[in-house]
Amino acid sequence: MRARFKFLIAILVVSISINVVIGYYYSDKYTLTQLSDKFTNFQTTDFEPVQIPEIYEEQVLMLSFEKNVFSKQDFTPWKTKLIEKFQNVFEIPDYDDITLMPVEEISEDEYDEYSLNKYSTSAQDGDNIIFYELKPKDNAKTTSCEDTICYSTVLVIPGSGNQGALDAINQPSQFSSYYYHKGIAEELVRSGYVVFVIENRGWGERGLDVQMNCKQPDVYCSGNQLHRHLFNLGYNQYSLQIIDTMQLLKHIHNLDYVNNEKIAIAGLSLGGPVSIAVSNLSPNVSGTIAASGVISQYKTVGSGITPGMLKYFDQPDLAASLSPKPLYLSWGLNEKSEFGYEAKNKYSAELVNNSYKLLDAEEKLVIVIHNEQFNHGHTFEMTSLTDFLDNTIG
């Protein structure tokens, strides 16, 4: 009996010691109020925009659609000033000034319905661009271009994350369990489109070991750390991605089997604003898709990729300037933070719709608010997206 009593005392001492250590750890990090909230409050709250003090808002959105466009006659002069200011703020060159570099084939794979080629080329600043081409084996989306068969083509710009292009082309990787692009490139090539997928700078196969003690698996950490470090060095990763994508699009324009009258650009998340920008700055883009990509940085105090931008314009202004060209925008009701805010409040959707309505082009605009559960709705809604492509470049 005495031995059993001693054993129970020992267990009690160990238990108390462990709880003291845990208590010390949390008391060193949190106040009692924070601890109470941390362990008792499991309710999530809806996203609410941050209220900025008025002293910082005396001169904002000076080139916005709402402040400058009141009639059809206002639209073209406004767009010209807007795009000029956009290029100035983000240091984006003209399409004609983009230099094409030699393209090297890295690998080639054959599947039952399509071929998959991997390429690399030097970027404008010497970085290494990686991209994939998926080409169908049937002629479902082809037309006759002079003396050859040419294809309707889609350029896909993935969202952030080290899932990267492999997510979009549905190839396995160490991040497969984090994929959220629904293998869009594979889905589209099976429908007959030639599909190109660019690897975003700083992510996936273009990621860098930035030695920032990122936890494994490193899905987002290293890319975000690199973005911030480049920003402090005077580089904007968003700008660099736009320039990379313009270069790839120019390469696509020079392929004899691509129908330059039937090219669409599709972006998810980060890829959304990139697709909007590239479509505004480049010729021969017949349709633009931005899924969970266009948000009001002004209303939601967004991602921080836009230094100085809100003095002049916001993301939905850039989307509105695409009118009357075919445009597809989507958001998910189950998305978190600013994306869910846009889905529920429709701020950007209504602003862009007003632009298309002004130019009598509402039939060219598709706005989808979906109820996807996958990845909390931060993904492509494939049915409406493929319908849009079939109706514009299919």
Task: Show where each model-derived region lies.
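Primarily recognizes the serine-hydrolase "nucleophile elbow" in alpha/beta-hydrolase
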Residues: 240-243, 247-311, 318
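N-terminal cap/lid segment of alpha/beta-hydrolase-fold proteins
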Residues: 94-147
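C-terminal catalytic histidine-bearing segment of alpha/beta-hydrolase fold enzymes
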Residues: 356-394
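The feature captures the conserved acid-bearing segment of alpha/beta-hydrolase catalytic domains
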Residues: 298-360
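Glycine-rich His-Gly loop
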Residues: 123-125, 156-162, 332
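N-terminal pre-domain segments of enzymes
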Residues: 28-88, 92
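N-terminal Sec-pathway targeting helices
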Residues: 1-15, 19-22
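Cap/lid segment of the alpha/beta-hydrolase catalytic domain
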Residues: 149-151, 155-243, 249, 253, ...
